[in-house]
């Protein structure tokens, strides 16, 4: 028996073991299948893929974080298997174009990774989102903010056009904002290289922003097409809508072809002229980008002429390539991806030409980019870490060869020998400086005042000194154009010797003031932690005997700011940048002192720079990095707490209402809600309404329009003392739930004007108007009723008499400007002409009798007649004190004579019925 039990238990155990093995194998297989796709998209080189930012036409965009440095990038993932060959060629063209352009307001391309299935583009990460969302959230912008954005857009566009690149798809969706609300032009998928003297043919872009010649399918100039798109964007910034909009695509295209649009009245006149010139149907009459820069609204208050980009044909120095073997294959591959260089053999022939041409210019631009930012393999440990669980890890596109392997000959015929870009107008700033070769590095200074707005303190002093020394002797490190060839060593040594001689002459000139210089240095060290650069300059100028050398101070500050990758434009020369070690190595304390001064200048940019910018005439330029503390408070976690203490709230308005009951306030509110077009309301409480105002199709459509949602509450005044017999005071509270603040304010102002226009206020205005009766002689043609001139005369006299002495008798004609009451008509006047019921369509041409002629003196304080009657309260009718006069809130002297008497007839009819 025991043996039988053992056999049964053994069979049960074996079956349980088999079931466990099957379950464990299934769980293992499910885990492997579920983890495979996650492991594939987990790493891209040293970057860990994180959340999805958005989805575009060609792929997905995710954030990536460097696993060592923590630097964030935006990774655009393109599925090569799902896209056609033509779309992939556009992606390759976008890569080549973005390698040509490096500008502070253009999104940067760092590196490219790929595997068999995907293509990964590592782009600059910006946290501000799209300009489109910013417009939808904020509504139309003020002129100052719109000008700042517009300047940055045309600055980037001018740089692209100088490189013969046309964007062709400019719209707010392709304009991104960084953390400082600066523009970054993105999405060069539609961009094209337009060779000088040629026209573009491809119709592309968005219909709302495309120019008429593109929609008609004609050949067009890409530069003029971009100007049209910029005009539409400027219209959207200032108006909050689009100039051409329609739900039907065919109708929209017809509107764009006609080019007829309406500019609202609130747009300034100078901006209206700019919009008309940019959104011009005829490309020949349309503004060029140079004309846009010269426009008074764009230049602002600065008197200096704007500095445009020079064409690259006048900037890039090209050389003779000895043979086909000397052509860099990587650069040749990138040029092949550009649409205008599809014929490879023709491209090679142009590159081997001894003359300066467009092909050679683009070649040396890309070659210089490769020299400055070589694509090298990633660290082995990082690659192994990312590829440990991935069968096909993304690999970085690297250079197949070094640039030093390919020799170059002499300068090409027609090439600029001394490029003006290096020595010329960009010496004062770093507008087009290189922005860091790796995404792990911070961009070197890139901001530049395109319109000549002056900086303060030592920066402007340094710029002035550089101009005094001569343009050929000093060049800004950041303004040294990175597309030109390296500086000749002999030229560099000559420039260094020139700078050293200038410094020695300056030191010898100031040698007699050594003691005062020491005192000035001590004073500057003490005030460095609490004063700005501008205050230091003013204190130095106020004490003539204490001299501080501005050259050493300003140069040191600039060197330290460029070392720390400051956002300000550095103005130190290339030689000063190379000799900064000698300046810092002469004495140890100088380095710490300079760092202290630098920290005092740059340590708290949010507040002390804001104070410095208050006195400037043009503080809204695209390069001003001033941070508005109000915006920072709104973005912070403690925004609601800080705004309640320091920032004035705009989403709640209270309107006090006096002399009205609760029911009358409700009735007036509901009447006002019903009278406003496109406004709907609902009752959510006994004294509470929910109001929603939706704008219909405007001039630009509803692309950027947003409705308003608000609560309207009627509450008793908390600070009133209720007295018996008096109407309590109420407060109507308007609370914004959603929508633009400016539109909410306008709606509240309209409703408050209706609520506060009480009966007593109207009566007071009528009394004041009655005391200001102007004498006038009414002819028969101007009287549109049965009343005669004598009635008008007596009416004016009796109105004055009533205010001077209420008990005094008046003329027998009438004491009421609107006509006598029925009870008055029964009283005889003693004249030949007795009053009867007036007729609205008959004019009374009866002559004035002798009894009424005594009232012809219109200036007398009172008047009496032989046939007078007692002005008792039982028989008199005073419309200015009666509730029946509520239908007219305007003073009496604002009515025309005919309208006044016709209104009196309506009052007669009501009195007769009573």
Swiss-Prot record:
The active site is at 169 (proton acceptor). InterPro entries: BRSK1_2-like_UBA (IPR048622), Kinase-like_dom_sf (IPR011009), Prot_kinase_dom (IPR000719), Protein_kinase_ATP_BS (IPR017441), Ser/Thr_kinase_AS (IPR008271). Residues 47-298 form the Protein kinase domain. Keywords: ATP-binding, Kinase, Magnesium, Metal-binding, Neurogenesis, Nucleotide-binding, Serine/threonine-protein kinase, Synapse, Transferase. It comes from the Eukaryota. Residues 444-462, 527-551, 563-573, 780-796, 850-876 have a biased composition (Low complexity). SMART domains: S_TKc. GO terms for molecular function: ATP binding; metal ion binding; protein kinase activity; protein serine kinase activity; protein serine/threonine kinase activity; tau-protein kinase activity. Its EC number is 2.7.11.1. Pfam families: KA1_BRSK, Pkinase, UBA_BRSK. It is found in: Synapse. Its cofactor is Mg(2+). Belongs to the protein kinase superfamily. CAMK Ser/Thr protein kinase family. SNF1 subfamily. Regulates both neuronal polarity and synaptic organization when bound to strd-1. Kinase activity is required for the establishment, but not the maintenance, of both processes. Binding to nab-1 is essential for role in restricting axonal fate during neuronal polarization but is not required for regulating synapse morphology. This is Serine/threonine kinase SAD-1. The gene is sad-1.
């Amino acid at each position: 028996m025991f043996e039988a039990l053992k056999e049964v238990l053994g069979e049960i155990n074996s079956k349980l073991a088999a079931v466990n093995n099957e379950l464990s194998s299934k769980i293992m297989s499910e885990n492997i299948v579920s983890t495979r796709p996650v492991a594939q998209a987990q790493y891209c080189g040293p970057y860990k893929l994180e959340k999805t930012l958005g989805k575009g036409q060609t792929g997905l965009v995710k954030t990536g974080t460097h696993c060592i440095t923590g630097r964030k990038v935006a990774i655009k993932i393109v599925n090569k298997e799902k896209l056609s060959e033509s779309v992939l060629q556009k992606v390759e063209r976008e890569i080549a174009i973005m390698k040509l352009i490096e500008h502070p307001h253009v999104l940067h391309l760092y590196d490219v990774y790929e595997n068999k299935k995907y293509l990964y583009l590592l782009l600059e990460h910006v946290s501000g989102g799209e300009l489109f969302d910013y417009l939808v959230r904020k509504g139309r912008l003020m002129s100052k903010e719109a000008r700042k954005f517009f300047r940055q857009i045309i600055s980037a566009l001018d740089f692209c056009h100088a490189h013969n690149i046309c964007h062709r798809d400019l719209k707010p969706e392709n304009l991104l904002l960084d953390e400082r609300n600066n523009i970054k032009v993105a999405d060069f998928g539609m961009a094209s290289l337009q060779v000088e003297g040629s026209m573009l043919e491809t119709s592309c872009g968005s219909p709302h922003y495309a120019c008429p010649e593109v929609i008609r399918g004609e050949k067009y100039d890409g530069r003029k097409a971009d100007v049209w798109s910029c005009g539409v964007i400027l219209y959207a910034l200032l108006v909050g809508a689009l100039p051409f909009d329609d739900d039907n695509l065919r109708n929209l295209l017809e509107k764009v072809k006609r080019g007829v649009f309406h500019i609202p009245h609130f747009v300034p006149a100078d901006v209206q002229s700019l919009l008309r010139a940019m959104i011009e149907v005829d490309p020949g009459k349309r503004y060029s980008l140079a004309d846009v820069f010269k426009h008074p609204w764009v230049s602002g208050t600065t008197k200096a002429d704007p500095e445009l980009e020079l064409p690259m044909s006048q900037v890039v120095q090209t050389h003779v390539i000895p043979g086909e073997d000397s052509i860099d294959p990587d650069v040749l591959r990138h040029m092949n991806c550009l649409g205008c260089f599809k014929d490879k053999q023709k491209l090679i022939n142009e590159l081997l030409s001894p003359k300066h041409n467009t092909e050679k210019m683009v070649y040396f631009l890309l070659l210089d980019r490769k020299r400055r930012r070589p694509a090298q393999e990633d660290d082995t440990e990082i690659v192994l870490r990312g590829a440990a669980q991935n069968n096909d890890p993304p690999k970085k596109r690297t250079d197949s060869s070094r640039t030093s392997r390919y020799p170059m000959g002499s300068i090409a015929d027609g090439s600029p020998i001394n490029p003006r870009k290096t020595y010329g107008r960009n010496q004062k700033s770093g507008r087009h400086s290189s922005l860091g070769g790796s995404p792990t590095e911070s961009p070197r200074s890139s901001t530049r005042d395109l319109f000549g707005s002056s900086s303060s303190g030592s920066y402007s002093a340094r710029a002035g000194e550089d101009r005094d020394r001569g343009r050929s002797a000093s060049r800004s490190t950041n303004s040294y154009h990175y597309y030109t060839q390296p500086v000749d060593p002999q030229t560099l040594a000559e420039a260094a010797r020139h700078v050293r001689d200038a410094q020695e002459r300056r030191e010898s000139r100031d040698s007699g003031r050594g003691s005062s210089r020491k005192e000035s240095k001590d004073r500057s060290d003490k005030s460095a932690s609490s004063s700005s650069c501008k205050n230091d300059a003013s204190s130095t100028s106020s004490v003539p005997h204490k001299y501080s050398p501005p050259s050493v101070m300003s140069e040191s500050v600039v060197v330290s700011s460029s070392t720390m990758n400051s956002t300000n434009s550095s103005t130190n020369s290339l030689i000063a940048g190379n000799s900064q070690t000698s300046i810092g190595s002469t004495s140890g304390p100088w380095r710490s002192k300079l760092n202290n001064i630098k920290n005092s200048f740059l340590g708290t940019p949010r507040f002390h720079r804001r104070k410095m910018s208050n006195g400037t005439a043009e503080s809204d330029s695209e390069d001003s990095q001033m941070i508005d503390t109000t915006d920072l408070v709104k973005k912070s976690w403690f925004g609601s707490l800080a705004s309640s203490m320091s920032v004035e709230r705009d989403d709640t308005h209270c309107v006090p209402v006096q002399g009205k009951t609760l029911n009358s306030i409700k009735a007036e509110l509901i009447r006002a809600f019903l009278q406003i077009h496109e406004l709907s309301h609902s009752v959510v409480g006994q004294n509470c309404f929910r109001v929603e105002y939706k704008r219909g199709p405007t001039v630009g459509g509803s692309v950027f329009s947003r409705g308003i949602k608000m609560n309207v509450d009627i509450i008793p005044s908390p600070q009133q003392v209720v007295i018996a017999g008096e109407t309590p005071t109420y407060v109507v509270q308007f609370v914004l739930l959603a929508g633009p603040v400016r539109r909410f304010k306008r709606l509240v102002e309209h409703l408050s004007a209706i609520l506060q226009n009480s009966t007593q206020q109207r009566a007071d205005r009528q009394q004041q108007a009655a005391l200001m009766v102007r004498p006038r002689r009414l002819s028969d043609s101007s009287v549109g009723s049965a009343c005669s001139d004598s009635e008008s005369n007596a009416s004016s006299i009796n109105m004055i008499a009533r205010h001077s002495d209420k008990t005094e008798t008046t003329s027998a004609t009438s004491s009421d400007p609107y006509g006598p009451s029925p009870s008055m008509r029964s009283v005889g006047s003693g004249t030949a002409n007795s009053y009867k019921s007036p007729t609205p369509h008959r004019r009374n041409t009866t002559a004035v009798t002798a009894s009424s002629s005594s009232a012809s003196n219109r200036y007398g304080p009172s008047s009496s007649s032989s046939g007078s009657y007692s002005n008792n309260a039982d028989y008199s009718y005073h419309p200015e004190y009666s509730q029946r006069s509520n239908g007219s809130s305007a003073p009496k002297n604002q009515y025309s004579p005919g309208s006044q008497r016709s209104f009196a007839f309506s009052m007669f009819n009501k009195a007769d019925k009573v």
